[in-house]
């Protein structure tokens, strides 16, 4: 039986997967071991670790209740990473997928879990060289985590549109705002959590899947949102890694506002109807971003994603005030109003330069050096 470890409600943590680049043509390089060795020459106390292939590195924040403190920590981690990368002549970048790397060139990181994933999923493991942001939100108990997971499912298209940063993949423009999620879709346990209404019901589902030999732990579920019982959180896993160090904090603030509304209103309207259109709405956000549509199965209506996001932000104003996140709410509103996205900026660079290497060089410079408040648009 999975035990849900209680945590302070509405606390936050984020994880970011980053590209490791050579500085000749800005392709991925197998630099994670060398970079980690350089980073760990002196004690630092930050959560920095390898990921499934050797052109990736993951950073994680501590637990925060205040998003401004989270930004301060991310800036400090960035300083450490950039200093270490300079010593090795490496570049670092955000973005959901490298624009022109080829999956067959990647190497699995020599860690037992990654070896098992590679043995089970074959070439999909190397194709999983994509880069995401995960957001953890503290929950008081397992029942609250189940409710919040279902509540957030309605807003997943918003997170996709706000974070989309992978228009190019394997050297081509995909026509999508985010190509990263197509790699995630290939895994059999991707998608969304089943419609269970309590932690006991979730445990019964998990135990059945475990008894069937399908899963051994929660890590085997590649859902867009999942409870994380060992942390006492709900984890949003849908976002591309943004191009700047500030945008992850805006996304975390949005998640915190939504969670506060869910908890304050004692939301418990768990039913299967919203999941009838979940995959379609998710596709619309991946393909069209802010220009996508959202279909409401209950009201049998369609609404533009941008309009729905702006309506939601208006409804969250009292929660932003209570959390001290008015600045973040205003920044999110501006992005939605102007349809500002990382994907659009990357396409503009390619239109100007005609070079995907130049695209990656610019996105690397932005992640490594841009000051907070300096947007890509």
UniProtKB/Swiss-Prot annotation:
<dbReference type="InterPro" id="IPR014746">
    <property type="entry name" value="Gln_synth/guanido_kin_cat_dom"/>
</dbReference>
<dbReference type="GO" id="GO:0042398">
    <property type="term" value="P:modified amino acid biosynthetic process"/>
</dbReference>
<dbReference type="Pfam" id="PF04107">
    <property type="entry name" value="GCS2"/>
</dbReference>
<comment type="function">
    <text>ATP-dependent carboxylate-amine ligase which exhibits weak glutamate--cysteine ligase activity.</text>
</comment>
<dbReference type="InterPro" id="IPR011793">
    <property type="entry name" value="YbdK"/>
</dbReference>
<dbReference type="InterPro" id="IPR006336">
    <property type="entry name" value="GCS2"/>
</dbReference>
<keyword id="KW-0067">ATP-binding</keyword>
<dbReference type="GO" id="GO:0004357">
    <property type="term" value="F:glutamate-cysteine ligase activity"/>
</dbReference>
<keyword id="KW-0547">Nucleotide-binding</keyword>
<dbReference type="InterPro" id="IPR050141">
    <property type="entry name" value="GCL_type2/YbdK_subfam"/>
</dbReference>
<protein>
    <recommendedName>
        <fullName>Putative glutamate--cysteine ligase 2</fullName>
        <ecNumber>6.3.2.2</ecNumber>
    </recommendedName>
</protein>
<comment type="similarity">
    <text>Belongs to the glutamate--cysteine ligase type 2 family. YbdK subfamily.</text>
</comment>
<keyword id="KW-0436">Ligase</keyword>
<dbReference type="GO" id="GO:0005524">
    <property type="term" value="F:ATP binding"/>
</dbReference>
């Amino acid at each position: 039986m999975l035990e849900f470890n209680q945590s302070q409600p509405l606390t936050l943590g984020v994880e970011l997967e980053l590209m490791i680049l050579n500085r000749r043509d800005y392709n991925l390089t197998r630099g994670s071991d060398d970079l980690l060795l350089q980073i760990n020459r002196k004690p630092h106390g930050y959560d920095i670790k390898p990921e499934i292939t050797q052109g990736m590195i993951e950073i994680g924040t501590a637990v925060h209740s205040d998003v401004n403190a989270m930004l301060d920590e991310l800036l400090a981690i960035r300083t450490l990473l950039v200093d270490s990368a300079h010593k090795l002549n490496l570049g670092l970048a955000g973005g959901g997928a490298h624009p022109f790397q080829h999956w067959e060139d990647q190497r699995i990181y020599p860690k037992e879990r990654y070896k098992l994933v590679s043995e089970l999923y074959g070439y999909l493991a190397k194709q999983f060289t994509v880069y995401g942001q995960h957001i953890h939100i503290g929950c008081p108990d397992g029942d609250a985590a189940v409710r919040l997971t279902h509540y957030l499912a309605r807003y997943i298209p918003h997170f996709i549109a706000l974070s989309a940063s992978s228009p190019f993949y394997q050297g081509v423009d995909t026509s999508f705002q985010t190509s990263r999620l197509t790699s995630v879709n290939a895994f059999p346990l991707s998608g969304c959590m089943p419609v269970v209404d309590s932690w006991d019901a979730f445990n019964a589902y998990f135990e059945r899947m475990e008894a069937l030999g399908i899963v051994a732990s929660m890590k085997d579920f590649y859902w867009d949102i999942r409870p994380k019982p060992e942390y006492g959180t709900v984890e949003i896993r849908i976002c591309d890694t943004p191009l700047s160090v500030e945008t992850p904090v805006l996304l975390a603030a949005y998640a915190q506002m939504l969670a506060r509304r869910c908890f304050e209103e004692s939301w418990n309207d768990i039913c299967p109807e919203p999941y009838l259109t979940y995959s379609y709405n998710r596709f619309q956000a991946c393909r069209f971003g802010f220009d996508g549509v959202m279909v409401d199965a209950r009201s049998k209506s369609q609404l533009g994603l941008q309009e729905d996001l702006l309506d939601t932000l208006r409804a969250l104003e009292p929660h932003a005030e209570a959390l001290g996140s008015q600045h973040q709410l205003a920044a999110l509103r501006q992005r939605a109003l102007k349809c500002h996205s990382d994907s659009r900026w990357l396409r503009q660079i390619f239109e100007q330069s005609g070079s995907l290497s130049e695209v990656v060089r610019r996105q690397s410079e932005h992640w490594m050096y841009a000051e907070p408040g300096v947007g890509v648009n």
